[in-house]
């Protein structure tokens, strides 16, 4: 555990943080799903209005690549729990991405604790796929197996332990891009999705009170988790 880490604090402090930033937020949604080693929680600063969650290991690691295969079934359990609430009929696209941070000093991301972004949307799958492919294919994206959680196993096989990377998934099609020259822009996929879907991109590092109000309205659209019923 790192005392200065946003995600090492645990479920209680995560819930308190939601309460401090968003007084009208239903705190039953703050911990969407929890198991022994992982927490699923809403992204506190969602860049779009569709359901936007983070899957976070409780132990302090800097990427999902560093997790042993013994955790992969637990990861799949969280994804299944999200699907049951947010996509029970399979009509929405499920988008996942991660900025995997393994090298010291690389500014790929601002939070040095692994977190997998999970988004559910009815926005056109073809447009999302086209835009992502257009932006990342020049970086030699590597396809991973479709079945879960085997794509996590393949992630370990395709990457060296100290590789930084981008992981992107839509509808169980998974791609990984190695960062060969420390060139990934900060918040790359967050900016891309907001721009593509027509949402105002709000940089969580600089959000003012009015922008926090907008983010709070986006958060309030999230349905209650199964544990709240």
Show where each model-derived region lies.
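HIT superfamily nucleotide-processing domains
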Residues: 1-229
């Amino acid at each position: 555990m790192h005392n200065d880490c946003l995600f090492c604090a645990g479920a209680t402090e995560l819930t308190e943080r939601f309460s401090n930033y968003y007084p009208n937020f239903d705190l039953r949604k703050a911990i969407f799903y929890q198991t022994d080693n992982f927490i699923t929680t809403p992204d506190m600063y969602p860049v779009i209005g569709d359901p936007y969650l983070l899957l976070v290991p409780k132990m302090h690691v800097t990427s999902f690549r560093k997790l042993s295969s013994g955790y992969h079934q637990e990861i799949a359990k969280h994804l299944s729990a999200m699907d049951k609430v947010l996509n029970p009929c399979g009509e929405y696209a499920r988008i996942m991405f991660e900025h995997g941070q393994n090298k010291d000093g690389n500014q790929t991301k601002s939070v040095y604790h692994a977190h997998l972004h999970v988004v559910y949307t009815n926005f056109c799958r073809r447009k999302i796929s086209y835009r992502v492919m257009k932006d990342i294919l020049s970086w030699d994206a590597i396809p991973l197996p479709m079945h879960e959680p085997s794509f996590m196993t393949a992630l370990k096989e395709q990457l060296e332990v100290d590789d930084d990377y981008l992981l992107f998934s839509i509808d169980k099609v998974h791609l990984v891009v190695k960062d060969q020259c420390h060139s990934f822009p900060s918040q790359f996929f967050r900016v891309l999705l907001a721009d593509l879907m027509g949402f105002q991109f709000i940089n969580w590092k600089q959000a003012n009170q009015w922008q926090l109000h907008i983010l709070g309205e986006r958060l309030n659209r999230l349905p209650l988790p199964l544990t709240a019923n």
